[in-house]
């Protein structure tokens, strides 16, 4: 199953999961993927792999234009068990472009072969260091969440410390 994604502005999906793995690509904009204790940034021109059954949320701070393909978990494809962001090569881009035109029905033999190529490209991809660990301390987490919502917030260390109940020395 494939779909185009057009998000006109700020948007956040509720935390959810898919029975299928999700391959998510960005043409324009920036998307943040929250999964567990990590957040991944998906910039334009890159692709995210989200394994099946991984609870996640998608957050867009601006207009986003991209696409999504879903990969059956039972396909025996031995795909990566952890999320990753990577830069697609020309082969993956061409295969995805074709797959996005497929009707929502069972794959024929040629489509199944191309889906296998897409799976090969996911397996062969090199993860990029776009994962951001999230703090476990509730006070630090509130600061990180506020900065994620408004990255242009220019509060000083002292102001953040006062707002979170930490000393500025602890925060620095």
Annotate each PLM feature.
Residues 11, 89-90, 158:
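Solvent-exposed, flexible loop/coil residues
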Residues 85-154:
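An amphipathic alpha-helical interaction segment
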Residues 1-85:
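N-terminal regulatory/effector-sensing and dimerization cores
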Residues 154-172:
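Basic/polar phosphate-binding segments, predominantly the helix-turn-helix DNA-binding elements
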Residues 18, 37, 53, 113, ...:
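Short beta->alpha linker loops
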Residues 12, 34, 132, 149, ...:
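Generic anion/oxyanion-binding catalytic loop in active/binding sites
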């Amino acid at each position: 199953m494939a779909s185009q994604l057009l998000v006109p502005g700020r948007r956040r999906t509720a935390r959810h999961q898919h029975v299928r793995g999700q391959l998510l690509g960005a043409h324009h904009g920036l998307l943040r993927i929250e999964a567990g204790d990590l957040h991944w940034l998906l910039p334009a021109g890159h692709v995210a792999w989200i394994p099946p059954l991984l609870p996640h949320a998608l957050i867009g701070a601006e207009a986003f234009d991209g696409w999504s393909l879903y990969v059956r978990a039972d396909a025996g494809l031995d795909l990566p068990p952890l999320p990753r962001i990577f830069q697609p090569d020309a082969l993956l881009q061409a295969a995805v472009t074709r797959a996005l035109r497929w009707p929502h029905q069972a794959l024929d033999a040629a489509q199944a072969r191309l889906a296998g190529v897409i799976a090969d490209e996911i397996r062969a991809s090199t993860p990029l260091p776009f994962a951001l660990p999230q703090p476990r301390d509730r006070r630090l987490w509130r600061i990180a969440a506020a900065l994620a919502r408004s990255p242009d917030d220019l509060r000083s260390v002292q102001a953040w410390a006062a707002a979170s109940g930490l000393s500025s020395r602890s925060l620095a």
